[in-house]
Amino acid sequence: MQQHDSDSFWGGIVKAMGLVFGDIGTSPIYTLTVVFALTEPTMQNVFGILSLVFWTMTILVTAEYAWLAMRLGRKGEGGAIVLKEILARMIRPGRQLTFVVFLTYLGVSLLMGDGVITPAISILSAVEGMVLIPGLGGLHQSWLILIAAIIAVGLFVFQFKGTDKVAGAFGPIMVVWFASLALSGAVSVASHPTVLFAVSPHYALQFLLDNGLAGFIVLSEVILCATGGEALYADMGHLGRKPIVRAWYIVFWALYLNYLGQGAFIISHPGAKNYLFGMVQHQAPLLYIPFLILTILATIIASQAMISGVFSIVYQGITTRILPLLKVDYTSSHLKSQIYIGSVNWMLMIAVVVIMLVFQKSENLAAAYGLAVTGSMSITGIMMILILSRTTKAWKAVFAALITVVDLVFFTACLHKLPHGGYWSIILASVPFITILVWTKGQRALYRALRPLELDTFELAYEQIYAKGRNIPGTGLFFVKEYNVVPPYVVHCIIRSNIIYERNVFISIVRTDEPFGLVSELKTGIATGLDAFEIHAGYMEHLEIETLLQQHGIKEKVIFYGVEDISTPNPVWKLFATIKRQTPNFVQFNKLPASRLQGVVTRVEM
């Protein structure tokens, strides 16, 4: 699955620009415009904001993700679930592990909620640049929303075909985008070179001291420059750490040079409505339309990266059993990381269009943006402290703690957004969060309610029935959670109904706490005519069960699996039962041959 080792130095950097940096790379479209909608664009304030932008990107993206988090991968994979799996090995079961699991669920949910806001604000802000085209200045906002919605819907409709064929163009397009940002910024800085001094932290501190509470609240808009920074770590599995970090150093200076250029433009044109588009139009009116097209392409690529990221998170959630099984399609014949989850895709599409209609303008959308990002960054920081403090490099935990304090300061500043649209971040994140809680608790409660039988007890009755010699020719396959614990449906089939084959195989799939790795083992002679087939697979591995069975010489005549008919007065368990009914069962998820499947219903009281 991993192809990044063979990528060339520059090839890896170009790929990273296309796959990882779309979100943070499109932040200059709206960040300073939103900030100076709240703040008077005086020279002193411009210097203060530019300094805050520099240090926000340095601390929250470079230090937190590029330097610290990206060294905490598992077989090249990153993300909240990876951090949880690392900690699970370090912490004994108890309150602390429960806290870590809760943080993981929250972090995953916030990132998935972010998958709605990112495409909405990116595409809408790019389309709004059309009003600066001569003759389109009077274009009504409703037309801009319609155009943005059409682009978004087109992007989601295209998902089922996969991005394999066009993904090769993402990197080169983003290279042109970052080069354009850097060039435009450099030209503007040349007219006002004193803005280069804004890198000094003195200006950031002075701004915060001079503006007090208002300055603190401005941090909730400054954070927009770092949104998408978490993708460095979350997308590490696609390319590896080195290409992403190398690309980030180039992207960082391209972005900051553009922010400096916008700062210089603001000083000379404080009345401009959108600083990036205004700056480019002022510099090269003839190139404005090509630049606008490039901007829209960049936001589409940014949105695509976020959609693919959500698919990847959901797949991790499915295989680690924190989310229900969903239909997963593989859109690439050679890259198993290229997946499509239809139900998630259409839910995202509807949510993105609704968000566009609710907020109308990108500057309004900015009011909802930031809360989920800073929450996710804070959770990453807390988990890094817990991990690093338990390693031989415990001194790194001190740096992680300082960074986490900065994360929490930004998160606190973003809380003021709650009544101004920020509550949408909570609403969007609550959908996956509630689903995760209901599903995980429901699975545990269901397992207890099923009251499985110990293998030793089962064998006594099994041997008596098998010895009668009325066995069905061929091989019967029975799916179980663990081969030494027998579920009720197997007891019903074999013991009560005497459905017993010449060869009976219990098959169990165990997902390990590593992202990759696949080991299968056939244990023969557990009892007369009874074998166990165990598959140990990493939580990112795509399983081809039929192939594995053939490799071990198992030619099944029929495949049995359990179907639970849940009866409960509890509203939470009713929701769990509904989710279970509406989502694919285990055999459907693994695309086993329908002609050989036999579901056995077990009535369960929860």
Swiss-Prot record:
Pfam families: K_trans, K_trans_C
Family the entry assigns: Belongs to the HAK/KUP transporter (TC 2.A.72) family.
Domain of life, per lineage: Bacteria
Gene of this entry: kup
Transmembrane segments: 18-38, 46-66, 97-117, 138-158, 166-186, 212-232, 247-267, 287-307, 339-359, 368-388, 395-415, 418-438
Keywords: Cell inner membrane, Cell membrane, Ion transport, Membrane, Potassium, Potassium transport, Symport, Transmembrane, Transmembrane helix, Transport
Annotated Gene Ontology cellular component terms: plasma membrane
Molecular function, one GO term: potassium ion transmembrane transporter activity
Localisation per UniProt entry: Cell inner membrane
Topology relative to the membrane: Multi-pass membrane protein
PANTHER family per the UniProt record, alphabetical: K+ POTASSIUM TRANSPORTER (PTHR30540:SF83), OSMOTIC STRESS POTASSIUM TRANSPORTER (PTHR30540)
Free-text function comment from the UniProt entry: Transport of potassium into the cell. Likely operates as a K(+):H(+) symporter.
Main localization, broad class: membrane
Protein name as it appears in the record: Probable potassium transport system protein Kup
Organism encoding this protein: Trichlorobacter lovleyi (strain ATCC BAA-1151 / DSM 17278 / SZ)
Recorded catalytic activity of this chain's protein: K(+)(in) + H(+)(in) = K(+)(out) + H(+)(out)
Keyword check for DNA-binding: no
